[in-house]
């Protein structure tokens, strides 16, 4: 198993995941308005739509960690990528604010690509290279998170907000596919 190859793929997947999460932030209030929310309620529902994902992720992350220890990091990366493909891509089709909040909640429930990529690389890299490898990996999610709002705003301006969600779904699907075919893991369950 080449940890360097895994690092390259995990970096790109983490970049796509970070970008996907932050792509939607700049225009969430506008999207909430398009769903029929008006006045002071726009800020509330936009904030709720953004934060509900983080809150649900915080609550279920320990469960995904236990399952990663039992079944491996790669399956958890694939699960997160494929599930978030549906939850984020599905936002393009929400008819109202309730579906938006529900899919954002589910998105948080099924998240976990980046922490599992980190755990995978940490378990494979030689000890004397762990700082450099994990530092490199973290630049992927940071670069994606920094790039996402600009790209999301640009795409929303030209192609419309709902198409940004489809693009995000495609990014997450690509991360899952790259993980399936190029990430290698010789997993031994944690005793």
Predicted segment positions?
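Symmetry-related core transmembrane helices of the 12-TM Major Facilitator Superfamily/SLC fold
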Residues: 164-181
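Small-residue (Gly/Pro/Ala) motifs that create kinks and tight helix-helix packing interfaces
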Residues: 29, 144-156
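Paired small-residue
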Residues: 87, 98-106
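Cytoplasmic helix-loop-helix junction between adjacent transmembrane helices
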Residues: 103-141
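Helix-loop junctions on the cytosolic side of multi-pass membrane transporters
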Residues: 179-190
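Helix-loop boundary and gating motifs at the non-cytosolic
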Residues: 3-38, 42-47
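Conserved MFS/SLC helix-loop-helix module at the cytosolic interface between two early adjacent transmembrane helices
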Residues: 59-91, 95
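Residue-level signature of mid-helix packing/kink "hotspots" within the transmembrane helices
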Residues: 54-62, 112, 145-146
